[in-house]
């Protein structure tokens, strides 16, 4: 069984037992999180599609860890004008383990 969920403005295809890095969620490590924005659920040949979300469908996850992605370096430059700007960014994430999918 698999589901397409929406969290942090992005969509992910998940199945039970899978680990997934999503945008940071304010929850403690080891806490159970319930995601209710389910776009689609499929099992074998049967597929349920929401408009836009499936009513009553949930995905239960456990927070495994919190962390930060690798640094992304931004460099802006104007040729011949002696203008250079350097900037870095590290995005926070939460790693989830998908426990159950209920449709």
Curated annotation (Swiss-Prot):
GO biological process, one term: translation
Key words, A-Z: Ribonucleoprotein, Ribosomal protein, RNA-binding, rRNA-binding
Domain of life: Bacteria
Cellular component, GO, one term: ribonucleoprotein complex
Signal peptide: none
Record's keyword annotation contains Isomerase: no
GO MF annotation list: rRNA binding; structural constituent of ribosome
Pfam family, one: Ribosomal_L21p
Entry keyword annotation includes RNA-binding: yes
Its job: This protein binds to 23S rRNA in the presence of protein L20.
Family: Belongs to the bacterial ribosomal protein bL21 family.
Quaternary assembly: Part of the 50S ribosomal subunit. Contacts protein L20.
Protein name, per record: Large ribosomal subunit protein bL21
Organism: Dechloromonas aromatica (strain RCB)
Lineage of the species this protein comes from: Bacteria, Pseudomonadati, Pseudomonadota, Betaproteobacteria, Rhodocyclales
